[in-house]
Amino acid sequence: MKPEPRTLPPSPNWYCSRCSDAAPGGIFGFAARTSVFLVRVGPGAGASPGAPPFRVVGELVGHTERVSGFTFSHHPGQYNLCATSSDDGTVKVWDVETKTVVTEHTLHQHTISALHWSPTVKDLIVSGDEKGVVFCYWLNRNDSQHLFTEPRTIFCLTCSPHHENLVAIGYKDGIVVIIDISKKGEVIHRLRGHDDEIHSIAWCPLSGEDCLSISQEENSEEPDIPNGKLIAETPITKGCYLATGSKDQTIRIWSCSRGRGVMVLKLPFLKRRSGGVDPTVKERLWLTLHWPKNQPTQLVSSCFGGELLLWDLTQSWRRKYTLFSTSAEGHNHSRIVFNLCSLKTEDGKQLLLSTSMDRDVKCWDMATLECCWTLPSLGGFAYSLAFSPVDVGSLAIGVGDGMIRVWNTLSIKNNYDVKNFWQGVKSKVTALCWHPNKEGCLAFGTDDGKVGLYDTCSNKPPQISSTYHKKTVYRLAWGPPVPPMSLGGEGDRPSLTLYSCGGEGVVLQHNPWKLSGEAFDINKLVRDTNSIRYKLPVHTEISWKGDGKVLALGNEDGSIEIFQVPNLRLLCTIQQHHKLVNAIVWHHEHGSRPELSCLLASGSNNAVIYVHNLKAVLESNPESPITITEPYRTLSGHTAKITSLAWSPHHDGRLVSACYDGTAQVWDALREEPLFNFRGHRGRLLCVAWSPVDPECIYSGADDFCVYRWLTSMQDHSRPPQGKKCIELEKKRLSQFKPKLKKKKKPTLRLPVKQDSSVGNEDESVKENSGPAENGLSDQDGEEEAQEPELPPSPVVCVEPVSCTDICSGFEKSKVTVSSKATSLKKEPAKEKPEALLKKRKARSMLPLSTSLDHRSKEELHRDCLVLATATHAKAELNEDVSADLEERFHLGLFTDRATLYRMMETEGKGHLESGHPELFHQLMLWKGDLKGVLQAAAERGELTDSLVAVAPVAGYSVWLWAVEAFAKQLCFQDQYVKAASYLLSIHKVYEAVELLKSNHLYREAIAVAKARLRPEDPVLKELYLSWGSILERDGHYAIAAKCYLGATSAYDAAKVLARKGDAASLRTAAELAAIAGEHELAASLALRCAQELLLMKNWVGAQEALGLHESLQGQRLVFCLLELLCRHLEEKQPLEVRGPSSIYHQWATGSEGTLVQRVTGVWRSAFSVDTPEQCQAALQKLQDVKYPSATSNTPFRQLLLHVCHDLTLAMLSQQAAAWEEAVPALLQAVVRSYTSGNFTLMQEIYSAFLPGGCDHLRDKLGDLSPAMAAYKSLEAFCIYGQLYEVWWSLCGPGPESSVWVLSAESTVSDKQSKPEDSASAEDMEQPPGPGPRLSAESERLLSACKELFSERHASLQTSQRTVAEVQETLAEMIRQHQKSQLCKATTNGPSRDEPSRDEPSQEAERAPSQPPSPTEERNAPVSLPELTRRLTEANERIAEFPESVKAWPFPDVLECCLVLLHIGSQCPDAVDPEMQQQAQELLHKYGHTRAYRRHCQSRHT
């Protein structure tokens, strides 16, 4: 059984009464998010020698929401069974050995809050929910019982260890009841005393009440009456003690025989070792209990700040307790403890395990009360991993819980030696980067845009940069300073500065010596240095080359830009990805092949990884930027976006990738082969890092809150999952914790959600379960981000575009506030029926209260008349009685003086407001003539109307201005932004109106207003176009975005955004647009991409039309012409099964007159007007700037054909221009591409079509002293090599062209007629000679020319190269075997020494075809490291002695040719010159000692 990968698990769930438990077999489990993690504890854990005896051994996966309860069965024979409860409403029973569900039930209708496996009944599981319902479930008989005792929220429950029918239940309000489940839940005791939540209940491990000598008098705080009402006398013969812990900061001991409390223990206020006591401690207290089985007189409890207390219950009057871990500083929990459970190990140790809010699981020795070990955990996504280049083995982990972990992965004494850093972070840590030279200097970036530096070797708080990113920090990198920071002397500036890339697309350069200073945006330097006029792309990734001379920037549009220091001059742009670039990594500098340091791997939101070789670009240092459209290697296999990449520091060209498909993949990038696939995560991978000390060890982090350490050789899979497996992984991911918060689409850039550090672990789990953060802008993949908890609905507040000014002297300046009850837009009234048109609704009365008072009884009306008469005819002032009457009869103000009338109108106005008719109140105020008061009151209440604003000019111009501004602000609260902008325009606030529309994403309206009211050259208009274009581009509306960029006179950006779609139509339109705008380089690159897309669709006509859009692509048109004719030629010779779209050929491609070369030159002359040497030379110069990577066996055939035709076009143009020294290397390059890709047929077609008469005429053209003579010899050798194989295969049976080589073939037809690979297999070499056919004269002439293949210099060079490769392979195998042996020693459940490891047979099987095994005694003979070093040194010295002319050009394998010739001689003895046979045998004898030819040579000699 292979060992489990080492795991940093998710944090145990918070605020659950029982979320961890331990079984007597040495298994401890704790609930974390939607799973349960299992930890093997004790000597049998299989931990490393000297390390603490524990190991994470597995995970129980099956719930879809948070696990709220976990309990083991403590009955002999079923220690492997456990039960879990979850917020998904299920209770599951598991087998921890198989990690599968045994059974489950969904009886609860509400959230389950408590769970326990009865310690006395082996198949009884009791659970309770938030509504007070208890279910008893008997596992063996699949039976259940429903109990509803109290309509209260259950917080915890515990079954009695002494009486099988008793269960103690604690409620949220502090009540504790003991029920008898055999009597339908009858309450035996109701225990009152606590006044807050019951967090934990623990039964005394001993039955009876003799273990504690507690008298009633001892409990001075308890009255001499029963604590709580005793419902009924219990028939229990023996009593028992019960302990309860509550949020009210007390522990109470209860007597079950008396039904009352006998002891109260108050938690002490301890001085926290990390600081003072938090005044809000009661709100955060969780008081959990554990009553040790072998210590009935002692009780363990948690305390305020994470301390653990051991209470001595025999001395209750002294309240005696002992603190855990009093001697060791920092070994206590730093925050409250939630769960305690005990475990007895195989060696007899009594341990206590605790889980806490500080995200640590701790193990305590009950004998010494000291901490034995700590298992750290993660409370958020693992966003970033980074190994320190100085302190090797220190792995920094950026986590979404607002903390940085530094894991010492090389610690011998502790496999989980982790330090936490949280000061100054306060948000999700999304990026990390160690300083390359300074120990302990760690840079970090967060989701709120913060960049800081931590000194991990000290306890100092971090330094924080004063310059924040507007969005999430996605990448950090240390690099050389660039202007303006690089200006000055050596001592005035740091040697390395910190670069950060944020989600808004900006890269900032920070001075680590002065983070309080301003950081610089490198875009300004890029723009100035390269004279860029167009909009710079949004940057999403940054990576410095190891030597610090080159910077790579990944962009949101999928492009990658390469810059050269010190001024960031643009060298080239890589146009390969079509979506946001998430990861860029340079190959390390310390490999055995220095040229590999120029490899750049990149991953994006597409599932394909591209590797580019920039060696030619960096060495040539082009004057103007070039565009690269072809990758050096393509790594395909993932099925989702790539999030992280890392090169192996131990291998050449080995890469590991992390992907959203839930797997990490190891690649051999040079061979384009997948090697190992890790599928241990249950979520989407976010980061990956290769161990700097172990070649097989890789660390990966994901959104499942886990970091795994895994070994490549222990993986069962070699490539990412495909087909149904992808669907299963997606279902598994979706089955995780389901968010309870409402999700909504975020209108801005993709960011991690900001979280509150005081929120519980489960709440954070909800937030973290949304899509993780990624570099740059969100892609159109339907992802949503969880938002912060929603607040009650409130009016939308707009950006304040106006400011209230004094309207006039004496008019008080008022602060306009709008009530949340602001009036909304009224809907248009429904159209009335025709018959109803005649019956209009009567207008509402302006003075309804006065009118109603005039319709009272006759007596009251008469009394009104008398009061009115008295008031009007009074000669002096009114007496008190008359004044009181007038106050009461306010409606008489209509008939008295103005003051009384105002009072009447005020009363009527209040009535209108109370009845919800403020417009009538406003009219009354207008009648009074108080227009300013009306406007001010309406503005304060948010009740301004169009009519009020319309009459505002009556009060003056300043009043009108103020009223319009206030009304516009009110309209913003009512989401009527367009109307608000119209009012702002009415007072000539054009800029404010435009800004209002823009800030509310009404770009179309804003542009219309700006275009109509502002000058055409106003920068606001261009900014509007660019802002709207960016948003449209982010949302995938590329065509409309292009219009915006065109409106902003940025045609370059318009063409770029159109091309982002990547289809042929979009690329063609973008190319045409760029050509119209005069962006010729961009037009050429887009036209070429369009032609390549059409090439995949076999649309040759469309491809030529696309290339014809730009004159500089004349050379590419010739390449595509040759490619079309070659494909047509191959189809005519070998008709293939038609798959996909049918080919659309030109008319000139259908003819068959003449040879292929004649047809090509004819079409060039007639269709493309390429006839003269000058024209050929011009086309040649354009094509020579295009470089394609070398081919491999995994190169797609269509891509191989394109590259081969490019080389053939160069050769033909060179011939027509009489440049023979360039023609021969180009022709050789085409042959070598076919040879290295393993396509022997294509290689032979090249010779038959382009060199039908052989290579002799090329020798005459070159001359013996030509520099290209070495290339000619290689070309001639490959020609003979191919013909040699055709002669050999023709001996096996009559093929289509066997008559050329064989006159009479008597041998039977065999499988050799099938298309062979580029070399003979071992079986072919070993075949006995058949009947001897007679070779033709042409064959004999060829065999006599084979002496050109028997080049001793090339044989010696190839042998030295094979020796180097074999030594390197042997060294790598020695390292692997050593690590495997160490792993087997350290892992008890690993493969035994007598059994071969899992991957050995596959390795032997892989070696079988190409590396035959050597003799047994030689294979088993060990080779020392000094001997291997000597062999390697000697081989490298021999290689260095060869002239460059020999090493520059490939040559057929000389020993392979010797073997083929000897086999032909064995079949046709008279056909091969004995002298040549002797020469071949001598070469084999002299140079055949390498592994590849050793067996063949020995069999040949024997």
From Swiss-Prot:
It comes from the Eukaryota. GO terms for biological process: regulation of translation; spliceosomal snRNP assembly; translation. Pfam families: Beta-prop_RIG_1st, Beta-prop_RIG_2nd, GEMI5_RBS, TPR_GEMI5, WD40. Residues 1-124 are annotated as: Important for interaction with U1 snRNA. Belongs to the WD repeat gemin-5 family. The SMN complex catalyzes the assembly of small nuclear ribonucleoproteins (snRNPs), the building blocks of the spliceosome, and thereby plays an important role in the splicing of cellular pre-mRNAs. Most spliceosomal snRNPs contain a common set of Sm proteins SNRPB, SNRPD1, SNRPD2, SNRPD3, SNRPE, SNRPF and SNRPG that assemble in a heptameric protein ring on the Sm site of the small nuclear RNA to form the core snRNP (Sm core). This is Gem-associated protein 5. It comes from Mus musculus. The gene is Gemin5.
